[in-house]
Amino acid sequence: MFKKSYQFFALVLFSIFNVLVTSASAIDLDEATRTVVADSNGNTTVLTPEQVKRGKRLFNNTCGACHVGGVTKTNPNVGLRPEGLSLATPRRDNAAALVDYLKNPTSYDGLESIAEIHPSIKSGDIYPRMRSLTDEDLFSIAGHILLQPKIVTEKWGGGKIYY
């Protein structure tokens, strides 16, 4: 009798846990939050919920090892904060500029190609994770980078005081 009650109790607990865990969903972001700067002219675009999810997944899988939390592990002085992106030459604070950078990265001052040391489409032979990324994938990654300061605020690119 005790064994059957124990099994039933375990089954009920497992079911409750399973329902709570599988019913958890990502935060629903409103249209204003999903709006990012699209190009250097200041035009904006609204990311779809699918692009938001895809950008996060691709960023974490492709870029997250070196840019966790918006910080650059190899050079903490150059991160993914909006201020840092806007001061780069050329500016990288819009989706089109970030996509261009992911295709052909240059130094912060824009004078040298750094494709051999920074993953990019151009260096897909060195960084295999970049090989199969499409322009849509790159746009989703750029959207993720531009969206994070709105979601995690000062934590994005804030460094080890937050992570």
From Swiss-Prot:
Q: Is Metal-binding one of the keywords UniProt gives this record?
A: yes
The record's annotation in InterPro entries points to: Cyt_c-like_dom, Cyt_c-like_dom_sf, Cytochrom_C550, PsbV_cyt_c550, PsbV_cyt_c550-like
The biological process GO terms on file are: photosynthesis, light reaction; respiratory electron transport chain
- Annotated coiled-coil positions are none
Q: Which GO terms describe its cellular component?
A: chloroplast thylakoid membrane; photosystem II
| Keywords for the protein's UniProt record, in alphabetical order | Chloroplast, Electron transport, Heme, Iron, Membrane, Metal-binding, Photosynthesis, Photosystem II, Plastid, Signal, Thylakoid, Transport
Which Pfam family, any one, appears in the UniProt record?
Cytochrom_C550
Co-factor note (free text): Binds 1 heme c group covalently per subunit.
Origin: domain of life? Eukaryota
For activity, the cofactor(s) needed are: heme c
PROSITE patterns per record: CYTC (PS51007)
Q: How does it sit in the membrane?
A: Peripheral membrane protein
Q: In the record, which residues are listed under signal peptide?
A: 1-26
Q: Tell me the residue numbers annotated for binding heme c.
A: C63, C66, H67, H118
Q: Name one GO molecular function term.
A: heme binding
Where in or outside the cell is it found? Answer: Plastid, Chloroplast thylakoid membrane
The Swiss-Prot or TrEMBL record describes its family as follows: Belongs to the cytochrome c family. PsbV subfamily.
What this chain does, per the entry, is described as:
One of the extrinsic, lumenal subunits of photosystem II (PSII). PSII is a light-driven water plastoquinone oxidoreductase, using light energy to abstract electrons from H(2)O, generating a proton gradient subsequently used for ATP formation. The extrinsic proteins stabilize the structure of photosystem II oxygen-evolving complex (OEC), the ion environment of oxygen evolution and protect the OEC against heat-induced inactivation.
Q: How does it assemble?
A: PSII is composed of 1 copy each of membrane proteins PsbA, PsbB, PsbC, PsbD, PsbE, PsbF, PsbH, PsbI, PsbJ, PsbK, PsbL, PsbM, PsbT, PsbY, PsbZ, Psb30/Ycf12, at least 3 peripheral proteins of the oxygen-evolving complex and a large number of cofactors. It forms dimeric complexes.
The name this protein goes by in its record: Photosystem II extrinsic protein V
Biological source species: Trieres chinensis (Marine centric diatom)
